[in-house]
Amino acid sequence: MGDVSELKMQITPATPGRIPVLNPFESPSDYSNLHEQTLASPSVFKSTKLPTPGEFRWSIDQLAVINPVEIDPEEIHRQASYLSLSRIDKDVEDKRQKAIEEFFTKDVIVPSPWTDHDGKQPSELHPSKCLTSNGDSPVGKKPSLPSQKCNAACQTLLSLPVDFNLEAVLGDYFRADDSVDQSPGNLSSSSLRRKLFLDVNGSISDSLPSASPRSPPNSARGSLEGQFSSSPIQNNAKKYSLGSLTTSPSAICSPTFSPIALQVGKTPLSEHRKFTFHSPEASSGGSSTGIANPSIRSPYIDGCSPIKNWSPRGLRGGPQYLSSLIRVPFALETHSEDEEDNVSSTDVAALGTNAVAAPLQQLDCEPLACGDPFVVSAMPVTQSQSSTCEKDLGLLGDFESERDHDTVDMVDPIDTADESTWIKEPVGNGNSPMAEFVSGIAFSIENSHMCMSPLAESSVLPCESSNVQMDSGYNTQTCGSNITDIVGTESYCKENVTQSFEAQMKPQVNNIKQDHTVQRCWMKTTSPSQCSSL
């Protein structure tokens, strides 16, 4: 027992955490380390051949190096011919071929599905066969072998005689049309080409050639009936011939993929297009300033701008037309309803007494001369409105602080003078003399044939400035307006002895360029207020 304990103490490793890499087969006498965990060496399964101490023999390569021999090619040919003649035996060769043929005909390895063979008969309990029951009870069950069906494919070498007429056998099933194959119209079988050559009614152009292969069976047709297809071939009367369709034209219409449908008779020039431009200044002005007085609103300003687009066909080679002239009285929201009625009645009376404004108001939708691109209509302000005008002029000082926070001067101001005047850049001629009237001006731009009344936009809010931007298609006009500024015009305000408010409007010729239009004007006033338009 003491020897065993001493042996255990000797084989106990000093460091049990270390895994020694040892090959136990290299030292079979060292049995003391066999119980430890070891890793297999790469040379464990390596086989080594030790030379046997028997008879020594040189290899062929070594003999060729030691004793090289020169071989004559004629000798090689002679030996080969001798061996070939000596080995030919017809009886032996016939036996070999017979054995090979018998092996492949009787001992079947992979039988062909098309030939009968005399090999093994399959067992009755073949897994491919099933038992069918003739009765419900287990006693009435009788095994019956169903008919077997073999579906297989094999590679067969077909040998045909020289005088075999292949066309007579397969000619009815495979008939090629040379005209269709050689013509470029053979591509018409594609769905894209069919869609391109369909006219509006769905019929196919007669220029396309027609091919008449056999139609598929009815089972293949029914599977494609419910599918969406751009092909004009529909229903059971499907034919793959593009030239001879049996369906009706309504059933072969190709689906319209483009949202632009063809509408005959509806062209852009056949009817006048009418556009309505909504003005944000006119719609939001009443709620921002609290003006609820209907007398200060123009009949044409109800959220819409009077700018309308005229058809170029109506204006080509003919006279130009103007939009409606607008009459806007200046009244404050502090007036009562009676004063508003008096003001409106006074305006109507003043328009009747003036001999100049009456014929000008009849110019609505009347043709103008080609040489007069601008026409100004006017209406007077009588002395009954002098108190209103005085209040309007008194608000100029209070309006200065509001305008500084709302608008930005586009040009440099000019020093003030004793009398309020307007100074503009001389852009062109064509000014029409009109004086002492509050008038609306209508621009007629020849390039875009557009008529507009900018007074409708500028007279919505008499106590608040507004900005209007008008796009005429080719030229863009941006103008600013306040209580004394009307879009695209120049005016001046003054107070005379009779305390009447007079505003003179002079037309301004637009300097129309190919890219843009610029309008500038400066104002001299006795008050610190300044206005400009660009």
Curated annotation (Swiss-Prot):
GO terms for cellular component: cytoplasm; meiotic spindle; nucleus. Phosphorylated by AURKA. Residues 115-127 have a biased composition (Basic and acidic residues). GO terms for biological process: cell division; regulation of mitotic nuclear division; regulation of mitotic spindle organization; regulation of protein localization. The modification Phosphoserine is found at S183, S191, S250, S305, S311. The keyword Acetylation does not apply. Residues 206-223 have a biased composition (Low complexity). The modification Omega-N-methylarginine is found at R316. It comes from the Eukaryota. One of its GO terms (molecular function) is protein kinase binding. Belongs to the BORA family. Interacts with AURKA. Required for the activation of AURKA at the onset of mitosis. This is Protein aurora borealis. It comes from Rattus norvegicus. The gene is Bora.
